[in-house]
Regions:
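Extracytoplasmic beta-rich repeat domains
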Residues: 1-22, 43-67, 88-107, 128-152, ...
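Structural signature of WD-repeat beta-propellers
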Residues: 29-30, 38, 67, 74-75, ...
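Short loop/turn segments that connect beta-strands within beta-propeller blades
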Residues: 38-42, 83-87, 123-127, 169-172, ...
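Short, catalytically relevant binding-site loops at active-site mouths
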Residues: 163, 211-213, 230-234, 243
Length: 246
């Protein structure tokens, strides 16, 4: 069906997506209300957990589904969990900084990255923080969303200055880190764009708008190869081929 949402400015820039269910979808409006629609486009429930002043900030929400719960992180430093069936709040918390990534779930934990280039691991049950890992910060705020993937017991993610970091999922300790940009990038992060990370299980692939397309080893973080391709769009893997659009 054609679901209609109240207007959100710069939607493409923030790479925001609805949460798709077996029957219907979940999305949000420009005041941060979360809405569940059925397949007939009828609203099953609609709830808002923001104060009057927070609603004026037009929070932008990222979703992940875990069994009967919807996990939400936003760009005004809140994160919360909602019961999918009732729309009622399980818990809500504040982070030190706004979030700037998708959410990844692994067993009883979920992961997200904030604007301070900090990867945070939270407990799904109550939202308590299990651990966090801050990577080097930049002087300007990134204009593109950070990406994270989970492989071989590690969370692997990028930050605003192009570092790719692998972290042990249980301990939060760094397994390896690969800087892909020179130190001068710290001043230029607003214009630096990097694609989402994708993997075939052995290598991680990503590209950026600095004319670099990388393949790096999952286990060690060493560079397999770099090609000259200018793209910040997510690469697509099919068997032995990689597709990208420059």
């Amino acid at each position: 069906g054609n679901f209609k949402f109240s207007k959100l400015e710069n939607l493409d820039q923030f790479n925001l997506k609805p949460a798709f269910l077996n029957e219907g979808i979940i999305f949000f409006d420009n005041k941060g209300s979360v809405l569940r629609f059925n397949d007939e486009q009828k609203i099953i429930w609609k709830n808002n957990f923001y104060s009057k002043s927070e609603k004026k900030l037009k929070p932008k929400l990222n979703f992940a589904i875990n069994n009967e719960d919807l996990i939400v992180v936003d760009n005004i430093a809140k994160y919360f969990s909602i019961n999918l069936n009732s729309g009622e709040l399980n818990w809500i918390k504040n982070n030190s900084y706004p979030f700037n990534s998708d959410i990844k779930i692994f067993e009883d934990k979920f992961f997200a990255i904030d604007y301070k280039n900090t990867l945070r691991c939270f407990n799904i049950m109550d939202g308590s923080e299990c651990w966090n890992l801050q990577t080097e910060d930049s002087f300007t705020i990134s204009n593109s969303k950070f990406s994270l993937i989970i492989l071989d017991g590690k969370v692997i993610f990028n930050n605003s200055i192009g570092d790719i970091t692998a972290v042990d999922i249980e301990t939060g300790l760094i397994a390896w880190q690969l800087p892909t940009q020179s130190s001068s990038i710290i001043n230029e992060t607003y214009n630096f764009k990097i694609s989402k990370l994708v993997s075939d299980g052995d290598a991680i692939f990503f590209s950026n708008n600095k004319n670099e397309f990388y393949s790096i080893d999952v286990k060690t973080g060493t560079t397999n190869w770099i090609n000259k391709i200018n793209s910040n769009l997510k690469p697509i893997l099919t068997k032995d081929l990689i597709f990208t659009v420059s």
